[in-house]
């Protein structure tokens, strides 16, 4: 029984299904252990998990029609998150249309990360977070208050984000769920 259909979006799609964030027989690497747990959690969750690539979306944007949630997981400018695939208007339009029509989007790490047209995270305005790379140092950033949310209701301990991410900040309107030393670790928009 599966309650939702989840798509993991990366450059490989089905080619590396379930092998995401594993290198050389799943040896521990500081750079990817923070993400491996997401894929592991999906393997035991009641979701129908599909691995799709950016080329799959280019070929047929309707591939997203039967998906409930898209996950984009990893560091910026890697095959995990897509790098310059996020400069392709067809990709951005298809994913934003999916979200506009009620689909969920969960980003972990630096999702949609690629410096382009004034943004580092190409879906920053959708996710409600952006990474400070030096281009927005002059912009005021007042959204630092943490909020309660149903996502954290069952958490009895401090959430472990692994390595976490530095220099992430919330845009106006986003709700910060966890920030550490004014670096957003979890937010909803």
What are these model-derived regions, one by one?
Residues 18, 138-189:
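Catalytic beta-strand/loop cores that center a nucleophilic Ser/Cys/Thr
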Residues 66-68, 173-174:
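Short, well-ordered alpha-helix to beta-strand connector turns
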Residues 1-67:
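Aromatic-Pro/Gly-enriched surface loop or interdomain linker
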Residues 12-15, 56-57, 76-78, 111-114, ...:
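Short, solvent-exposed loop/turn segments at secondary-structure junctions
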Residues 21-31, 48, 72-88:
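The substrate-binding groove and active-site-proximal loops of carbohydrate-active enzymes
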Residues 68-75, 106:
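Structural motif
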Residues 1-3, 41-44, 62-63, 74, ...:
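Extracellular ligand-binding/catalytic regions of CAZymes and related secreted enzymes
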């Amino acid at each position: 029984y599966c309650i939702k259909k989840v798509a993991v979006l990366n450059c490989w799609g089905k080619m590396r299904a379930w092998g995401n964030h594993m290198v050389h027989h799943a040896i521990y690497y500081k750079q990817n252990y923070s993400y491996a747990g997401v894929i592991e959690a999906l393997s035991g969750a009641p979701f129908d998990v599909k691995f799709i690539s950016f080329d799959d979306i280019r070929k047929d944007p309707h591939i997203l029609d039967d998906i409930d949630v898209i996950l984009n997981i990893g560091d910026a400018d890697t095959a995990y998150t897509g790098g310059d695939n996020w400069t392709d208007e067809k990709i951005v339009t298809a994913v934003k249309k999916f979200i506009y029509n009620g689909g969920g989007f969960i980003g972990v790490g630096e999702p949609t990360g690629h410096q382009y047209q004034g943004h580092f995270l190409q879906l920053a305005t959708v996710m409600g977070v952006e990474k400070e790379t030096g281009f927005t140092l002059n912009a005021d950033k007042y959204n630092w208050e943490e909020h309660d949310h149903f996502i954290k209701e069952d958490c009895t301990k401090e959430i472990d984000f692994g390595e976490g991410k530095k220099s992430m900040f919330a845009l106006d309107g986003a709700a910060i769920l966890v920030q550490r030393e004014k670096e957003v670790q979890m937010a909803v928009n």
